[in-house]
Each structure stands twice: as C-alpha cells, then as structure tokens.
From Swiss-Prot:
Oxygenase that can act as both a histone lysine demethylase and a ribosomal histidine hydroxylase. Specifically demethylates 'Lys-4' (H3K4me) and 'Lys-36' (H3K36me) of histone H3, thereby playing a central role in histone code. Keywords: Chromatin regulator, Dioxygenase, Iron, Metal-binding, Nucleus, Oxidoreductase, Phosphoprotein, Repressor, Transcription, Transcription regulation. One of its GO terms (molecular function) is iron ion binding. Its cofactor is Fe(2+). It is found in: Nucleus. This is Bifunctional lysine-specific demethylase and histidyl-hydroxylase NO66. The lineage of its organism: Eukaryota, Metazoa, Ecdysozoa, Arthropoda, Hexapoda. It holds the Pfam family JmjC_2. It comes from Drosophila virilis.
Length: 907
C-alpha cells in the first residue's frame, strides 16, 4: 500500500522535526534496565502465542501495554477489524490520561510510541497474521493516530490555556499499578524549562534523569522546597535564570489546578506520542529518545506546577490531594515566588545604587566600616539605628514593602549632611589642620639645625651626645642651651611659654595611659601611686595587686591624683626622649607622669634631689615655687619630707602652665601644684642629675685614695699616741695645750701628705660613677638605619647539613664604630679589666645585674681606640693589636654584643 502512511510518518507530519543535541551520560545514579535476551523473548513469545490460541486467536495480546500502562484484557477484546466504536473507546482510554500532568515509562525503558504502533515484542508473536490483516490494521492505526492528534490539540487548548510556554505542556506522572514503579526525572537546568514545547531539544542536552534503581523506591524532588542535591549534568531547580519562568508559571498554574488534579486521578497516563501531540512545536524523535526527553521535561513541568510525585508506598491509589494540602502547597508556592521577586529587586537595587551613589558615600560599606561623613537615613525610611553615622545597604524589608515600585526608585541615596552638621565637620577639619600644623612645627623644631648651626648628619653618622643636646634644645626652645646653662642651670627657675597645645601630645595622652594599663601588667606602689592632699595632709591610697583600668579610673573619678613611676618602660616616645637625653647628661634621665583631676592636689609642698623639667601635656596647673628653708637644702642631695603651708613663705614663682609650656627648677626648690577648677592636668616630669655632684665623686674617690695610701705609706700604719684621749675629743675641745696642738698638726700633715688623690685615682672614681650609669641607664632605641648595621638586624640559618650559616663576616677592611658614645665603659676591677655596657639593660630600673665582659690587658688598647674615634668609623685593621686574626676576633666579639655598628650594612 504505497499511499498508506505509517503511524511514525503520521506523527511526523503533525509535528515539526528538530535536531536534538546529544545527551551527556550521567556519572551517578545510572538507569537500571532489564536486558531481555533472545532466549527470554522466545519463551515469552511462545507463551503468549499459546495464550492467544486458547482465547480464540485474538489479534491483540492478553494484556496490552497502552501508553506505557499494563491493562487487563476486557471481556470483549478489540482486534484489528473492530468498528468505529472500538476506536472511540480506545481514544477515550488514551485521552483520559492526557491532561498535561505526567510522563509514562516502564521499568525496561521500552515505551511504545503509540498503542497501535507495532513494537519489538509484537514482531515475533504475530507471525500467523496475513498481509491483508496487517494492512487493514495499519489503516486503523493511521485513522486512530489522526483522531488522537485532533483530540490532543483540543485538549491542549482547553486545559493548558494560552500560555503554552509556562504551563501548557506539563505532563502527568508515571504510573504502573502492576509493578508499583515510580520513575521521576530530576530537574535539569532551570533556564532550559522556559517552554514545554522545547522540552526535547533543551532537556536532551543534559543527562539529568534520576531513576529509582530497583523499581520500588523513588526519588521525589518537591517543587515547594529547594533541592540541595542536583543531578549530574543539570543545574539546581530555582536558579536565577528561571525566575521569570517560575513567576509566570505560578500565576498560570492556579487556573489549571482543577484540570491537572482531575487528570492525575486516572490510572493510565499519556504515551510519548500523545505528549508530543499536546505541544505543536515538539519535534519527532525515535521512541527511546522521546521517552527520556519526555520524562525529563514532564518532571520539570511537574515540579514547576507544584505537584508531588506519587509515593510508591500507597500503591498509587490515593491520588486525590486533600484541599488542605492544596492550600498549603499554594502558600508555599506564593512564598517561593515572593522570595524570587525579592532577590530580583535586591539585584536591581544594588545595580541602581552603584550607578547613583551619593557624593559622601562613594563605596558601599557595611555599617561597621562606613564613612562617618554620610549619616543614616531616617528611622522610618530605613529602619536602622540612629546612633551610627554610615551609609548602609538597603534594609531587607525594603524590597518586600516596595515590590511594586520601579527598580530605579529601589536604591536609597545617601543623604547629604544638614547644614549644621557640615559646619561642625568643617570646624573639626580646621581643628585637625591646626593640630597637624602645630605637630609639624614641633617636629621641625625637633629636627632643625643644632644650636651651633651644624647640619644634622645621617643617622648612622650622628653623635649621640649631640643628639641628646638637640633634644634638650627641643624642650627649651627658643632658648639656646648655652643661655640655659649659663643663666638657669642649678641657679634659677625658668618657664618657657608656647601657644602650641599639641607640642608634647606625641609623648603621652589620656588614651595612651588607658592602653598602657590594658596591655601591660602594672602594679600599685611599684608602678602606680594613688594620692590625695586635703586639709594639709597627704594620703596614699594604693591597693594591692595589678592596676587595672577600672580601678585606676575609679580613683581618678573620686578626686585622686595618679602618678606613673616609670612610663618610659611602656611608652616608646617617652623612652626615646629619655634615652637620647641620657647621652648628653651622662646620667639616668627618669620620667614620672602625673594625672590630676580638676580642682585637686595630689602632693604636699616638698623639694626633690633632681633637676626637674615639667612638660605640660594636657589641661592647666598652677605652680608655686619657694626658696629652700635652709642653706644646706640648696642643691639638696636627698628629697625632703612634706611641708605645711605655715612653714612656707611667699612664693618666688607663681604661674599657670598650659599645654605646650615647660618649667625648669633646680633640685632643692620647694614646690607645689594644684589643678584648675574646670580642667584636669596631665604633665611629665623629667628628672636629671640625681646623685651626680662632686660629693658623689669624692664618696667614690676618697675611700680608694685612703686605701692606697695605707698600703704604700708606713706612717699611716703607725699606732696613735697613748695620751691622745686625754687631749682630743668633745670634752677636751676647749682646752689649750702643746700636746693637743701637736696631735692636731700631725693628723693634718698626714692627710695633706698621703691623702692627696692622684690622677689615676680620680679616673678610677669617675669610672665607678660611669659604671653606675651603665647599670641604671635605659637601653638604646635602635633606629632602622642602625638596625641593619648591627647584630639586631642579623639573621642566621642552617644549611642542608645542619650547619649554622651567619649573614655577616668582619674583615680588616670593615669600618666600625661604637653604637653610642657612652654605650660601654672600660673599668679596672682589681687585677682584671672589664667592659661594662647598657645595651642589654632591662626597661625597669636596675632589674638585672650590670652587664660586663672581661678582656685581656693587651686588648684594652683596641677598646680605647674605638672610644677615642667616636663618632667616626675606624677600620678593623687600625685597631692596635698585634695580629690581624686578633683584631678581627675583638671586633667581632664587640659587634656580636651589639656594641659596634658597621659603616655599611652586610645585606
């Protein structure tokens, strides 16, 4: 029959043909198919053939597979010569399951493309049918296929609505009542599901069919919730690309919910040919390809429709969803849609904000790191806390409240500060600029030319003594150091007033004190004193233990004065100032910090044994100075007790120190200070020249002179006259006799003759004072230029054999010098020579024993040469030692202890 059209061709005429992309093979969850061997097929064919003969040689099998659903035989079997009523019943049975809700597939993936199309199983089973019967059956099949196509097109128009892209081609679930097999295709890329008519072309490109392996379990991916686990080859449902599709589908799915639910009650579902016919744009494909593509697209449409797959445990009997469950699913769908709309609007808001950023907030910042110049919107607009000043992102509730607003209005602009706020900002900026100018001026005065007009050299070429003198000049400028020492040093008090409040602010501040208390372990009495002076009585309120900030500030709030005894241990700027000045003064330069609350006084009137420099850092304080009460108190060697106001006369000096001012007064000067009624006071007292008088030298000198005279002169070792007690003493002081005069004369002659110190003895006494300085001094603050030229910048490492490799090597061509002018002292201790040094001292006062190294007498000349050459560099070859090896050894030993610095860095 040449003009007869096959069922395959009939479907091809109805649907346009499209080229399907190749499918990727899934790496996980492979489909489990039952491979039927020829032997198995032969057995089944023989069995069914015998059954057909027993039933009267019917044209159809005892149990037919229509649309992928195995149905039981009817009482009146339908053959190839049935009339039109049989065709109508067949169409009704097929159309009853086609309501765009499901997809049919059997366990073996052998779905028939049409109930009338001959399958592979029927080929060997119907060998007894004649050619005439086959041609007539083919005619019936063609007619039936055409009727089915017409019916399906009407079904698509009635049930699926006009929007075929979003909801018109959602298919039914796969149902097999005999095997209870539920096979569901997992969703692929969401962007591929925009049109059900392109299910095959788009879904076949992703290998995302996830089947139940054993036929009795199913993988159910509900569209109401997000599936976290995606099948391989497909993307997760609910991705950003399907936002528009899901929105349209959700709006259209409510209109078709009744028809979809009714179609899901049928026990048979549509086959691949029917599903293709329901979509006019679907392309014709082989049966196997259509089965896979249909399962894939139908599951995606089923997910988008919000309907769940039927659980295999209920045997597919309870397919009618209760009204409460439907309502719950609709609510979940609405929430899902709302979330998707919020995401879209947030993206649009972010894009508009980036395009239309406010001038004061060029970058999007979080609330914690936002620019302070951009205040928050009002509380009603943004719902944010009013305390912070920042430019926040739009609140999460804003998109939900303004979902219908255009995207260009979604982003919030950072409002400009009000006029009064801008004025305050300008005032703060001016104050900051003034502070910066004053600090720069202070730095210029600190880094200006030396008083003698000498230009400062590079750091590694500077003289530490001159640097200490420069620091003194920074304290007292515009006064010169020469005028200061000639007019005021150890004579009169001196005040230098400045109109620079931030002149000393880099040294210490209220904030630095608080940080110091938190970061370091300071103890009361050892590091901090808490004092008050009320009604002529000074009291100390030191508790035990560590000085924690709450405790210290609690005392301060109660009107107590806080004294920090060793701030140079914890504050680097104060330490650097003291370390540089001690090189110039050749003695320890200490520092105390006094923090006094308003309208209070912490200490009673007294005098000290130090030369005092008072640096007013913050606030105001009134100072009054008095003359020493006794002549012996002038330049006192020890501090006094507390005086009462009645013991003091009229003050010699009465003035108020303001921030940036400095006050100097000699040791032995009685002083007291009281805070202003409205302002607190923070000042630093630098103490200089403590126990640095001639008396201290003689205390070191005379015992040594006497001991040496006794050792070398016999006259000092002779015994006293027997009658000396009868002529000398307190009771005999008023008597006049020759024996008394003789005894007094002999004693004076011995002192004048044998106790006159020699130059060497005076040198030794000075060395002892210098030795004390080496023990008390602060360690040097090594600058970066010095760091790379000293041992402090050296780094050693090991080679592959575990041997240590040093990154330095001194030779005779290496030029070296001392790190500081007073970094070491050569002292004779008995029969040995020692080199004392302070480079390894602790930051606390005399925490450790003095550091020293013993050298051979022949090596002393090398140390002396280095001390004499300072601040110039000296080549190792010029050290006065006999051999080059010994010169290198001595220089290396001093360099490794941090006492020497090379002219050129090793690295």
């Amino acid at each position: 029959m040449a003009d007869e059209v096959s069922a395959y061709a009939a479907y091809g005429k109805t649907l346009p043909k499209k080229q399907a992309p190749k499918r990727r093979q899934a790496k996980r969850w492979p489909k489990k198919t039952t491979k039927q061997t020829p032997k198995t097929l032969a057995k089944r064919t023989a069995k069914r053939a015998s059954g057909d003969k027993a039933n009267g040689q019917n044209n159809g099998a005892a149990a037919k597979r229509q649309n992928g659903v195995q149905t039981k035989p009817k009482a009146q079997k339908l053959g190839t010569h049935d009339n039109a009523s049989a065709d109508a019943r067949r169409i009704d049975s097929i159309s009853g399951s086609i309501h765009c809700n499901g997809v049919n597939s059997n366990n073996n993936n052998n779905n028939s493309s049409s109930s009338s199309m001959p399958s592979k199983k029927n080929k060997g089973r119907r060998s007894d049918v004649s050619d005439t019967e086959q041609s007539e059956s083919l005619d019936d099949t063609v007619n039936l296929a055409r009727k089915m196509a017409d019916y399906l097109s009407e079904c698509g128009e009635q049930n699926c609505g006009s929007d075929a892209d979003s909801s018109g081609s959602s298919y039914g679930e796969y149902d097999s009542s005999d095997n209870d097999d539920n096979m569901s295709g997992e969703s692929g890329s969401a962007s591929e599901s925009e049109s059900c008519s392109e299910d095959y072309d788009k879904s076949s490109g992703s290998d995302s069919d996830n089947e139940c392996g054993d036929g009795d379990s199913d993988v159910d991916c509900d569209s109401d919730v997000d599936c976290d686990s995606d099948s391989e080859g497909g993307s997760a449902w609910g991705s950003e690309s399907d936002d528009q599709f899901s929105e349209e589908y959700t709006l259209n799915s409510h209109a078709n919910s009744s028809s979809n639910n009714n179609s899901s009650n049928n026990n048979s579902s549509s086959n691949n040919s029917n599903s293709s016919a329901s979509s006019p744009e679907a392309s014709v494909m082989p049966a196997a390809g259509r089965r896979k593509a249909t399962k894939r697209s139908e599951h995606l449409a089923s997910n988008s429709d919000g309907s769940d797959f039927i659980d295999s445990n209920n045997n597919n009997k309870n397919k009618n969803t209760p009204p409460a469950a439907k309502q719950q699913k609709l609510q979940v769908q609405q929430r899902l849609k709302q979330k998707q709309l919020e995401k879209q609007e947030k993206r649009a808001n972010a894009a508009v904000q980036r395009e239309n950023a406010a001038p004061f907030c060029p970058l999007q910042r979080t609330a914690t790191t936002a620019a302070k110049s951009c205040p928050l919107p009002s509380k009603e607009a943004a719902g944010a806390k009013p305390g912070r000043k920042s430019c926040p992102l739009p609140s999460k509730s804003a998109p939900a409240a303004n979902k219908m607003a255009p995207n260009k209005m979604a982003a919030k602009m950072c409002a400009l500060p009000p006029k009064n706020e801008r004025a305050a900002q300008q005032q703060r900026k001016r104050a900051e600029r003034d502070e910066q100018r004053q600090e720069a001026k202070g730095r210029r005065s600190e880094n200006e030319l030396l008083p003698e007009g000498k230009q400062r050299q590079q750091v590694h070429l500077q003289d530490s003594i001159e640097e200490g003198k420069r620091m003194l000049h920074w304290l007292i400028n515009p006064m010169t150091s020469d005028d200061f020492f000639s007019q005021y040093w150890e004579r009169n008090a001196c005040q230098v007033k400045r109109k620079q409040p931030n002149y000393f602010s880099q040294l210490i501040s209220f904030k630095l004190i608080d940080e110091m208390l938190i970061r370091n372990h300071l103890e009361f009495t050892t590091n901090i004193d808490v004092t008050t002076y009320k009604n002529g009585m000074r009291e100390t309120h030191n508790p035990d233990g560590r000085a924690m900030p709450p405790t210290v500030w609690g005392f301060y709030s109660d009107g107590c004065s806080i004294r920090i005894l060793n701030p140079s241990t914890y504050l680097i700027k104060v330490r650097q100032l003291c370390a540089m000045m001690q090189e110039f003064f050749h003695c320890l330069v200490g520092a105390n910090v006094y923090l006094t609350p308003p309208n209070s006084q912490g200490f009673a009137p007294h005098y000290d044994d130090i030369e005092a420099f008072v640096l007013q850092v913050e606030g105001r304080k009134r100072w009054r100075l008095y003359s020493p009460l006794h002549p012996s108190d002038v330049l006192a060697r020890n501090s006094s007790g507390n005086y009462s106001q009645a013991e003091l006369g009229e003050p010699l000096f009465d003035a108020v120190l303001e921030p940036g001012d400095i006050l100097y007064f000699p040791r032995g000067t009685v002083h007291q200070a009281v805070c202003d009624q409205q302002q607190h006071s923070l000042h630093i007292t630098l103490s200089v020249y403590q126990q640095q008088a001639y008396a201290n030298l003689l205390e070191e000198l005379m015992p040594a002179v006497l001991q040496r005279a006794i050792k070398h002169h016999l006259s000092l070792r002779r015994g006293l006259p027997l009658h000396i007690w009868q002529h000398l003493g307190l009771a005999k002081g008023d008597q006049k006799s020759e024996l008394r005069d003789e005894l007094l004369g002999n004693t004076k002659r011995l002192v004048q003759q044998y106790l006159m110190p020699s130059d060497a003895q005076i040198d030794a006494a000075v060395d002892q004072l210098a030795k004390r300085f080496q023990h008390e001094a602060l360690p040097p603050v090594v600058l970066p230029e010095e760091h790379e030229r000293t041992v402090f910048g050296s780094r050693s490492q090991a080679n592959s054999h575990g041997q240590c490799l040093c990154d330095y090597e001194l030779t005779e061509r290496t030029s070296v010098r001392l790190l500081r002018a007073n970094i070491l002292r050569l002292v004779a201790e008995g029969s040995s020579l020692r080199v004392y040094y302070y480079v390894d001292n602790a930051l606390e006062f005399c925490k450790y024993e003095a550091n020293f190294m013993e050298i051979q007498p022949t090596e002393a000349a090398a140390v002396e040469a280095l001390m004499s050459a300072y601040p110039k560099y000296l080549k190792v070859a010029k050290l006065p030692l006999r051999s080059a090896e010994r010169r290198i050894e001595v220089a290396t030993a001093l360099w490794e202890r941090g006492l020497l610095m090379t002219e050129q860095p090793f690295k």
